[in-house]
Amino acid sequence: MIIYQLKDGYRYNSDTIMLYNFIFDISPKGDILEVGAGCGVLGLLLKRDLKNANLTLMDIQKENIKLCEINSNENRLDVNTILADFKEFKSDKRYDAIISNPPYYHDGVIKSENLHPNISRYSSNLSLSDLIQNSSTHLKSHGSLIFCYDAKQLMNVAYLLLKNKFCMTKLKFIYPKIGKKAKIALIEAKKSSKSLCLVDEGFYLSDENGYTKEALKLFKKANLESKDIVLGKNYD
């Protein structure tokens, strides 16, 4: 799959690939909304591999929606796009699943001078509370919110999910290297559910020799080829 990205903008990383595989294993069906789609790589991978899924890609940035359209056309994948701020989004439609790789860096971290990656990375642009609360509004009963987040903030994640009547039903930790602490938590939470939480085996990205066999296998499964693109000022 060919994915065009802004040369000087936010670029997807291994977190996206890990989340893609996590969602693929869950295999949600029906109407799926991706919040903060960026260049569209997560949603397009799922549209390619989940035959019973209808994907809608949402982003607050106009240039990202254009990238989603370019990438969906390039790969001949039929998805919908919505240019909107999820915090302000209003719709009567209810989704079977909402997926997101949300921003989780806090404001104390030194920011880039480039606005595009800042909006994608920092939680001030879409707080965890906003994501969870608004997902509850736009999900069907027992619909799934599937996302990744900073593993160090898992207690806050669990609190906000319970506060908004979600039940965490699946959890998987991603470790940057064997012997290191978990960096990312992959989470599925179901609205109005009382299910127990299944904790998956952890995933290790690298060892002393480089990427693990499991990571290389996953990268091959994703089969991504990234290309840089520069959008002109007029890209309606």
What are the functions of these language-model segments?
Residues 1-26:
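S-adenosyl-L-methionine
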Residues 2-5, 12, 125-176, 180-182:
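Conserved Class I SAM-dependent methyltransferase catalytic core
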Residues 19, 101, 131, 189:
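Residue-level signal for inorganic ion chemistry
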Residues 21-91, 97-100, 106-108:
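Conserved SAM/SAH cofactor-binding pocket of Class I
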Residues 69-70, 110-112, 158-161:
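Short amphipathic alpha-helical segments
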Residues 103-130:
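Mobile active-site "lid"/loop adjacent to the S-adenosyl-L-methionine
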Residues 182-236:
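SAM/dcSAM-binding transferase cores
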